[in-house]
Amino acid sequence: MPQILKAARIDGHRLALRDVAPADSDFIFALRTSASAAAHISATPPDRQSQIDYVTAYQRGSGAAYFIICERDGPPLGTVRLYDPQGESFAWGSWILKADAPLFAAIESALIVYCYALDHLGFSAAHFSVRQENAKVWQFHERFGAERARSEAGQYYFRIGGAAIAASLARYRRFLPNGITVTR
């Protein structure tokens, strides 16, 4: 059965995902409390210490991977998490990009997540939820082949299978032409 494993770094074409550290807490706090992000994510406690505590607890735990999205040798652009393994499926979320992130960052970071989960961790599907009012994001996922499993309490719940993920990896190959390199 697949399991979610942390990685120190995952390099893509122009982006890298690196494991979060307590030093990233200020960036994460600012990102999560920005007006553009806060409208579409779960509430963030109003103090930075809560974010530091969350990251510290994550580092001690297992069963999740939490990354800072950045240009390969550049400053942080966003965050993404893999969590909630259910058999062959994993959840991903906390996917937040700065408003001024390069246009390719959304597609490439999603491809990196799928490539890591399927090719390196052994998953064959994903599940996640998106707030209904966040049309830009749920439309993005639907273009990748995700299907709405249900909707309730202002959320759409999605599933995407291995065939749809493989089709998206092929369709958007120009954003990740050489796959990924994982450093544990």
Stretch-by-stretch model annotation:
Residues R14-A30:
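A short beta-loop-alpha structural element at the N-terminal edge
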Residues P46-G93:
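Acetyl-CoA-dependent GNAT
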Residues C70, S94-A106, R131:
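A short, internal acetyl-CoA/4′-phosphopantetheine-binding micro-motif in the GNAT/acyltransferase core
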Residues D84-G93, A101, A105, H120-S124, ...:
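A conserved beta-turn-beta hairpin within the catalytic core of GNAT-like acetyltransferases
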Residues L103-A117, Q139-R143:
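Conserved acetyl-CoA-binding loop-helix of GNAT-fold acetyltransferases
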Residues H127-W138:
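Conserved beta-strand-loop-alpha-helix junction that forms the acyl-donor binding cleft
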Residues S129, G145-G162:
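Conserved catalytic-core motifs of GNAT/GCN5-like acyltransferases
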Residues G154-R184:
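C-terminal "cap" of GNAT-fold acetyltransferases
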